[in-house]
Amino acid sequence: MEPKHPEITIVLATGNKDKVRELKPVLEALASGIHVRSLHDLGLDIDVEETEPTLEGNARLKADAIFELVAPRLDWFIALADDTGLEVDALGGAPGVYSARYAPVPEGVARTYEDNVRHLLSEMRGKSKRTARFRTVIAMKGRLPAANGSAVEIEETTDGHIDGLITTEPKGNGGFGYDPVFAPEGMDRTFAQLGIDEKNAISHRGRAVVAAAKRIGEYLSQCGIQ
Protein backbone atom coordinates (compact mmCIF):
# COMPACT_ATOMS: atom_id res chain seq x y z
CA MET A 1 0.00 0.00 0.00
CA GLU A 2 1.30 3.46 -0.91
CA PRO A 3 2.01 5.69 2.09
CA LYS A 4 -0.55 8.42 2.62
CA HIS A 5 0.99 11.84 2.16
CA PRO A 6 -0.17 15.01 3.94
CA GLU A 7 -2.61 17.10 1.94
CA ILE A 8 -0.78 19.79 -0.02
CA THR A 9 -2.53 22.72 -1.66
CA ILE A 10 -1.19 24.95 -4.40
CA VAL A 11 -2.98 28.27 -4.04
CA LEU A 12 -3.19 30.31 -7.22
CA ALA A 13 -2.91 33.90 -6.11
CA THR A 14 -5.21 35.33 -8.74
CA GLY A 15 -8.84 36.12 -9.21
CA ASN A 16 -8.39 36.04 -12.99
CA LYS A 17 -10.38 33.04 -14.23
CA ASP A 18 -8.51 33.01 -17.53
CA LYS A 19 -5.17 32.61 -15.74
CA VAL A 20 -6.59 29.84 -13.54
CA ARG A 21 -7.81 28.00 -16.65
CA GLU A 22 -4.30 28.07 -18.14
CA LEU A 23 -2.35 27.28 -14.95
CA LYS A 24 -4.42 24.53 -13.38
CA PRO A 25 -3.89 21.62 -15.84
CA VAL A 26 -0.09 21.82 -15.63
CA LEU A 27 0.00 22.00 -11.84
CA GLU A 28 -2.59 19.26 -11.29
CA ALA A 29 -0.33 16.83 -13.14
CA LEU A 30 2.53 17.29 -10.65
CA ALA A 31 1.69 14.50 -8.20
CA SER A 32 -1.23 12.56 -6.81
CA GLY A 33 -2.91 14.21 -3.86
CA ILE A 34 -1.94 17.73 -4.87
CA HIS A 35 -4.91 20.10 -4.72
CA VAL A 36 -4.86 23.20 -6.90
CA ARG A 37 -7.15 25.95 -5.63
CA SER A 38 -7.85 29.52 -6.64
CA LEU A 39 -8.58 32.29 -4.15
CA HIS A 40 -12.25 31.96 -5.06
CA ASP A 41 -12.17 28.23 -4.27
CA LEU A 42 -10.91 29.05 -0.77
CA GLY A 43 -13.52 31.74 -0.22
CA LEU A 44 -10.86 34.46 -0.17
CA ASP A 45 -11.22 37.89 -1.69
CA ILE A 46 -8.07 39.98 -1.85
CA ASP A 47 -6.76 42.39 -4.44
CA VAL A 48 -3.05 43.08 -4.01
CA GLU A 49 -2.06 46.43 -5.47
CA GLU A 50 0.83 46.06 -7.90
CA THR A 51 3.13 48.82 -6.66
CA GLU A 52 6.53 47.41 -7.62
CA PRO A 53 8.41 48.66 -10.73
CA THR A 54 9.21 45.15 -12.00
CA LEU A 55 7.30 41.99 -12.85
CA GLU A 56 9.45 40.11 -10.32
CA GLY A 57 8.61 42.57 -7.57
CA ASN A 58 4.87 42.44 -8.21
CA ALA A 59 4.82 38.63 -8.37
CA ARG A 60 6.67 38.41 -5.04
CA LEU A 61 4.37 41.04 -3.53
CA LYS A 62 1.31 38.94 -4.37
CA ALA A 63 2.85 35.63 -3.28
CA ASP A 64 3.86 37.17 0.08
CA ALA A 65 0.36 38.56 0.66
CA ILE A 66 -1.35 35.27 -0.14
CA PHE A 67 1.13 33.33 2.00
CA GLU A 68 0.29 35.47 5.04
CA LEU A 69 -3.43 35.08 4.38
CA VAL A 70 -3.37 31.31 3.86
CA ALA A 71 -0.74 30.32 6.47
CA PRO A 72 -3.19 30.23 9.42
CA ARG A 73 -5.62 28.05 7.42
CA LEU A 74 -3.41 25.41 5.81
CA ASP A 75 -0.50 23.37 7.13
CA TRP A 76 1.21 22.52 3.85
CA PHE A 77 0.79 24.72 0.81
CA ILE A 78 2.47 26.82 -1.86
CA ALA A 79 1.20 30.28 -2.77
CA LEU A 80 1.85 30.81 -6.45
CA ALA A 81 1.52 34.26 -8.00
CA ASP A 82 2.42 35.66 -11.38
CA ASP A 83 2.84 38.98 -13.08
CA THR A 84 2.87 39.29 -16.84
CA GLY A 85 3.83 42.13 -19.12
CA LEU A 86 3.84 42.86 -22.83
CA GLU A 87 7.04 44.66 -23.82
CA VAL A 88 6.82 46.47 -27.16
CA ASP A 89 10.15 47.64 -28.58
CA ALA A 90 8.76 50.63 -30.50
CA LEU A 91 7.19 51.89 -27.26
CA GLY A 92 10.36 51.60 -25.20
CA GLY A 93 9.21 48.42 -23.50
CA ALA A 94 5.71 49.69 -22.66
CA PRO A 95 3.20 48.72 -21.49
CA GLY A 96 5.37 46.39 -19.35
CA VAL A 97 4.27 46.27 -15.70
CA TYR A 98 1.30 48.46 -16.63
CA SER A 99 -0.04 45.99 -19.20
CA ALA A 100 -3.24 45.24 -17.27
CA ARG A 101 -3.97 48.93 -16.70
CA TYR A 102 -2.57 50.48 -19.88
CA ALA A 103 -5.58 52.20 -21.40
CA PRO A 104 -6.72 55.48 -19.83
CA VAL A 105 -10.31 55.23 -18.60
CA PRO A 106 -12.53 57.62 -16.63
CA GLU A 107 -12.40 57.25 -12.86
CA GLY A 108 -14.81 54.57 -11.68
CA VAL A 109 -15.01 52.89 -15.08
CA ALA A 110 -13.77 49.30 -15.31
CA ARG A 111 -10.95 48.85 -17.81
CA THR A 112 -11.47 45.97 -20.28
CA TYR A 113 -9.14 43.85 -22.38
CA GLU A 114 -10.59 45.57 -25.44
CA ASP A 115 -9.71 49.01 -24.03
CA ASN A 116 -6.07 47.99 -23.63
CA VAL A 117 -5.90 46.47 -27.12
CA ARG A 118 -7.40 49.57 -28.73
CA HIS A 119 -4.99 51.83 -26.87
CA LEU A 120 -2.01 49.70 -27.88
CA LEU A 121 -3.00 49.73 -31.55
CA SER A 122 -3.48 53.48 -31.35
CA GLU A 123 0.01 53.93 -29.90
CA MET A 124 1.43 51.65 -32.62
CA ARG A 125 -0.30 53.43 -35.51
CA GLY A 126 2.21 54.23 -38.26
CA LYS A 127 5.09 52.35 -36.61
CA SER A 128 6.93 49.88 -38.85
CA LYS A 129 8.89 48.26 -36.01
CA ARG A 130 6.39 45.90 -34.37
CA THR A 131 8.61 43.48 -32.45
CA ALA A 132 7.52 42.65 -28.91
CA ARG A 133 7.68 39.98 -26.26
CA PHE A 134 5.46 38.64 -23.53
CA ARG A 135 7.14 37.96 -20.17
CA THR A 136 5.74 36.13 -17.16
CA VAL A 137 7.37 35.88 -13.75
CA ILE A 138 6.01 33.37 -11.24
CA ALA A 139 6.74 33.75 -7.53
CA MET A 140 6.33 30.83 -5.14
CA LYS A 141 6.22 30.96 -1.36
CA GLY A 142 5.17 28.08 0.86
CA ARG A 143 6.04 25.22 3.15
CA LEU A 144 6.08 21.47 2.61
CA PRO A 145 6.47 18.59 5.08
CA ALA A 146 10.03 17.24 5.23
CA ALA A 147 10.69 13.54 5.76
CA ASN A 148 12.05 14.23 9.27
CA GLY A 149 8.87 16.00 10.33
CA SER A 150 10.17 19.54 9.92
CA ALA A 151 9.10 22.05 7.27
CA VAL A 152 10.78 22.80 3.95
CA GLU A 153 10.44 26.49 3.18
CA ILE A 154 9.96 27.57 -0.43
CA GLU A 155 10.60 31.07 -1.75
CA GLU A 156 11.78 31.64 -5.33
CA THR A 157 10.78 32.78 -8.81
CA THR A 158 10.74 31.39 -12.34
CA ASP A 159 10.16 33.18 -15.61
CA GLY A 160 9.28 32.62 -19.24
CA HIS A 161 9.09 34.75 -22.36
CA ILE A 162 8.18 34.56 -26.03
CA ASP A 163 9.05 36.94 -28.86
CA GLY A 164 6.62 38.00 -31.54
CA LEU A 165 5.01 40.83 -33.49
CA ILE A 166 2.13 43.22 -32.81
CA THR A 167 -0.45 42.90 -35.57
CA THR A 168 -2.24 45.89 -37.09
CA GLU A 169 -5.67 44.62 -36.06
CA PRO A 170 -7.17 42.05 -33.66
CA LYS A 171 -7.41 38.49 -35.00
CA GLY A 172 -9.08 35.50 -33.34
CA ASN A 173 -11.61 34.99 -30.57
CA GLY A 174 -9.65 32.85 -28.10
CA GLY A 175 -7.32 33.72 -25.25
CA PHE A 176 -7.52 36.99 -23.36
CA GLY A 177 -5.69 40.28 -22.86
CA TYR A 178 -3.46 41.20 -25.77
CA ASP A 179 -3.69 37.74 -27.36
CA PRO A 180 -5.65 38.98 -30.43
CA VAL A 181 -2.81 41.33 -31.46
CA PHE A 182 0.27 39.22 -30.60
CA ALA A 183 1.61 36.84 -33.24
CA PRO A 184 4.34 34.53 -31.85
CA GLU A 185 7.62 34.57 -33.74
CA GLY A 186 7.51 32.31 -36.79
CA MET A 187 3.71 32.05 -36.81
CA ASP A 188 1.12 33.77 -38.98
CA ARG A 189 -1.57 33.43 -36.30
CA THR A 190 -2.12 35.35 -33.09
CA PHE A 191 -2.39 33.77 -29.66
CA ALA A 192 -6.15 34.32 -29.92
CA GLN A 193 -6.24 32.07 -33.00
CA LEU A 194 -4.53 29.15 -31.23
CA GLY A 195 -6.19 26.43 -29.16
CA ILE A 196 -5.43 26.54 -25.44
CA ASP A 197 -3.14 23.49 -25.57
CA GLU A 198 -1.24 24.88 -28.56
CA LYS A 199 -0.87 28.23 -26.84
CA ASN A 200 0.24 26.75 -23.52
CA ALA A 201 2.93 24.71 -25.26
CA ILE A 202 4.75 27.85 -26.44
CA SER A 203 3.48 30.77 -24.37
CA HIS A 204 5.41 32.86 -21.88
CA ARG A 205 3.07 31.82 -19.08
CA GLY A 206 3.23 28.18 -20.13
CA ARG A 207 7.02 28.27 -20.04
CA ALA A 208 7.10 29.97 -16.64
CA VAL A 209 4.58 27.45 -15.28
CA VAL A 210 6.59 24.51 -16.59
CA ALA A 211 9.70 25.91 -14.88
CA ALA A 212 7.73 26.44 -11.65
CA ALA A 213 6.24 22.96 -11.86
CA LYS A 214 9.71 21.50 -12.29
CA ARG A 215 10.95 23.25 -9.15
CA ILE A 216 7.86 22.24 -7.17
CA GLY A 217 8.35 18.67 -8.37
CA GLU A 218 11.92 18.76 -7.09
CA TYR A 219 10.72 19.99 -3.71
CA LEU A 220 8.06 17.27 -3.58
CA SER A 221 10.66 14.63 -4.42
CA GLN A 222 12.91 16.02 -1.69
CA CYS A 223 10.02 15.57 0.72
CA GLY A 224 9.31 12.03 -0.51
CA ILE A 225 6.03 13.00 -2.17
CA GLN A 226 5.33 11.49 -5.60
Curated annotation (Swiss-Prot):
GO cellular component term, pick one: cytosol
One term of GO molecular function: nucleotide binding
Matching CDD domains: HAM1 (cd00515)
Keyword Protease among record annotations: no
Keywords: Hydrolase, Magnesium, Metal-binding, Nucleotide metabolism, Nucleotide-binding
Quaternary structure and partners: Homodimer.
Binding-site residues for Mg(2+), renumbered to this chain: E49, D83
Cofactors named for this entry: Mg(2+)
EC number(s) stated in the UniProt entry for this protein: 3.6.1.66
InterPro entries according to UniProt: dITP/XTP_pyrophosphatase (IPR020922), ITPase-like_fam (IPR029001), RdgB/HAM1 (IPR002637)
Reaction catalysis annotation: XTP + H2O = XMP + diphosphate + H(+); dITP + H2O = dIMP + diphosphate + H(+); ITP + H2O = IMP + diphosphate + H(+)
Keyword Translocase: no
Superkingdom field: Bacteria
Designated name of the protein: dITP/XTP pyrophosphatase
Matching SUPFAM superfamilies: ITPase-like
Phylogenetic classification of the source organism: Bacteria, Pseudomonadati, Chlorobiota, Chlorobiia, Chlorobiales
Active-site residues, Swiss-Prot/TrEMBL: D83
One GO BP: nucleotide metabolic process
Co-factor binding details: Binds 1 Mg(2+) ion per subunit.
Role description: Pyrophosphatase that catalyzes the hydrolysis of nucleoside triphosphates to their monophosphate derivatives, with a high preference for the non-canonical purine nucleotides XTP (xanthosine triphosphate), dITP (deoxyinosine triphosphate) and ITP. Seems to function as a house-cleaning enzyme that removes non-canonical purine nucleotides from the nucleotide pool, thus preventing their incorporation into DNA/RNA and avoiding chromosomal lesions.
Organism: Chlorobaculum tepidum (strain ATCC 49652 / DSM 12025 / NBRC 103806 / TLS)
